[in-house]
Amino acid sequence: MYLEKINAPEDVRQLNTEELRALAEEMRQALLFRLSRHGGHFGPNFGMVEATIALHYVFDSPRDKIVYDVSHQSYPHKMLTGRKNAYLSEEHFEDVSGYTNPEESEHDFFNVGHTSTSVSLASGLAKARDLKGEDGNVIAVIGDGSLSGGEALEGLDFAGEMHSNFIVVINDNDMSIAENHGGLYRNLKLLRDTDGKAECNLFRAMGLDYVFVKDGNDIEALIAAFRQVKDSKTPVAVHIVTQKGKGYALAEQHKEEWHWHLPFDIATGKTTVPAGGEKDYDTVTAEYLLKKMQEDASVCAITSATPTVFGFTKELRERAGKQFIDVGIAEEHAAAMASGIAKNGGKPFWGVYSSFLQRTYDQISQDICINQNAVTIAVYTASVYGMNDVTHLGIYDIPMISNIPNLVYLAPVTAEDYLAMLDWSLEQTEHPVAIRVPIQYISDGKPVTKNFGNLNRYEMTQEGSEIAIVALGSFYPLGVAAAEKIAQKTGITPTLINPYYITGLDTDCLEQLKKNHRVVLTLEDGVLDGGFGEKIARFYGDSKVRTKCFGLKKEFLDRYEVSEVLRENHLTAEQIAEDAVTMLAE
């Protein structure tokens, strides 16, 4: 095997063309081995094997600096830069993350997981090189889907005025996670159809030289193109046309499904991980929205390139027709456009991952909330139980958006809560609303009669004394368990409160607790600093009531075990009960 002998990029440069092709096949087999057992990004990596080999064959990493956009397509890069064992041996799977990571290798320059950043990051490397009077190539590798992000276009706009070496490799597989959306993709198609000869050329218009590679999975053609641009003195775009999922028939045929995949059986492609429950919030949301759309033509569902976050498969997107809007990887545009839709009488729903919400704070604050337009934002994977890569954490959204004036941020506990909140939000016209969608699907079958327009009214679900537990959203079940532990340890029945509202205090409820409670505990599924619990602690600051806030400390976690993080932050029912007993005794 050739791959077993590759310990660094210089080993790649010792191989001839036939050996490089054999290496590519071995790398795909290694990818198949790891991904079938571990899961991960499939299609992007299978399509980038030859291009990665050619990059390391022509350029001298890490002296020549390669920056991968999103970096979900960096598995082949890791194989060739000393980390092959993570793809050849199951016991080494956890040696690497799914993204570039400078702690792993000198060949990785940034922790990257969000999209459209590579051109800007790489242009910074190039600028620093020039300021210091150094040389060397700087290469940004970006997929065509990532070009729909504004930061990518900002970076290309800047690159067009550079007067030194800067290479942008456009990996064009005619796909984002799902299909691409946006006018610029007509130009990419025109360039593909004309072998890069079309007079209308986005990259030339931005001031970059341009090289086209018709077959981006042809190692010889790639090597020739990269040699052509190596040590260039002006910015240049190398447009390579690749096949997403190349080498595995199912991934070639079903590109969206195989963008990322759970562990699977290689022969059949069927997932080997046991399926979850019958219901989940993706499915429930999709069912609700489609019904709502049929009843009301002004309802629309917006996604920024992740339509399945709220269950909109290709079939459902087609059923929704013009009421489904995919803006591409453009969260800023999604938020601002939603505000415009609401302003003109539409009823916009925008579903977005908590981590990606970070990309559009200004539009939420300025364009939505200052204007007080009735946009509904569903925030997904906002939990310690969500994605656990450092670049995709969903634990910062409460401090980030709950302090924006005019916004109503809601925390449902059950599916019934969630659907009632959705219905209220889409029908009202007074408030921008965000809903923190739980991870765990809970249905109690109880009808929800609460009027969410009567803002900041908590629900006392269990009346007790001495100790009150205010348990927010997805941590409400933890509050129930902690209350039971406290009762077992002390004989005291704690008061249990479901607050529903992240953005406001029910001062009447909190004032009432002063009469017969000495301790108030708050529970939230996110970081404590600037969060929900601190607001309640501040309310009781000048009173005799003692408060303790339970949540996560402020840190960047990476590939963590949830149970360990919960224990470290005293977020088990037993630990919460012990702390409560200690507070009563003091």
What is the predicted function of each stretch?
Residues 1-79, 204, 215-219:
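N-terminal amphipathic, basic-rich helices that act as targeting or association modules
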Residues 19, 24, 28-31, 40-47, ...:
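Cofactor-pocket helix-loop regions in the catalytic cores of large enzyme subunits
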Residues 29-36, 95-111, 133-139, 314-328, ...:
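Glycine/charged-rich beta-loop-alpha catalytic/anionic-binding loops adjacent to active sites
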Residues 41-162, 299, 304, 313-314:
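Cofactor-binding active-site loop characterized by glycine-rich and histidine/acidic residues
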Residues 65, 248-358, 363-373, 470-473:
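Non-catalytic terminal/interface segments that mediate subunit docking, oligomerization
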Residues 73, 108-265, 270-278, 282-287, ...:
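Glycine-rich ThDP/TPP pyrophosphate-binding loop and its adjacent helix/strand module
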Residues 86-96, 161-175, 369-381:
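A glycine-rich helix N-cap at a beta->alpha junction
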Residues 271-275, 386-388, 408, 527, ...:
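Peripheral docking tails and interdomain loops at the edges
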